[in-house]
Amino acid sequence: MYQRTATQLARKPASKQGETEMNNSIQDLKQVEDYYGTTRRFGDSDATIYEIWEQGGAFNDSITPSTYSQEYRSHLGLKLKSLTEEGAIIFSIGCGNGFVEGDLVQAKRRVLAIDFNDEAVALSRKKGVDAYTADFFELEPGALAGVKSIYADGLLGHLFHPELELKPTFEKLKELNLESGTTLVFSNDSPRDPEALFAAHDKVDGFWFISRDYLRDALTEAGFKIEESYYFPYTRPISGLRNRTLCVALVP
């Protein structure tokens, strides 16, 4: 039986101070680290965003749908289970708290995961996920051999570049030599303006909202085959009803 661990799949960067030139041009990793690692007042104590999310809570309008919306969490779990069989390897990029990933472990999927933030990795590992700290752009060609499905919830909003858009991200995916038939499951909040293809977050620097139509067309342009493209509605504590872009694609 094919066996591979997240340690083999994901190489931990030697330093978070010295990232590759390409990655620096796409994502401000220090900005990401500060946003998630800074403690904020929550109830009677201080907590990081991850600690707040772990309790199913919100910091102002900041939530993760996989803990704040049980319907969303259930939908994503069912979607990924429908795309894989028991024992299949699912690879989560930017696993965060790892709630959907933990549910998939309980459903007898083998879940490997990476996240740039050590705290996220620790929380995911507590849920049985084989998670390690790593940078997506540092993965080596062939690192995801044997993976049947790739899942990224909210990651694309961090990787979107105002000029390069998602081209470097999808080029990196293709460099990993994914097996034909591998499914890609991407999820990200869409812009509030239904006419906008993408839009910068007005509260979180460096994060972008991505529409269903944009993501579908960008994946198609990158050479992937679209299986599903739709919106999943859910509510946030302040902004209210929001649409979550969901797109399922196949590696040809």
UniProtKB/Swiss-Prot annotation:
- InterPro entries in the record: SAM-dependent_MTases_sf (IPR029063)
**General function of this protein:** May play a role in tabtoxin biosynthesis.
**What is the native source organism of this protein?**
Pseudomonas amygdali pv. tabaci
Superkingdom of source:
Bacteria
Residues of the region (Disordered) are: 1-23
Record-given protein name: Tabtoxin biosynthesis enzyme
Q: Which gene encodes it?
A: tblA
SUPFAM superfamilies given in the database record: S-adenosyl-L-methionine-dependent methyltransferases
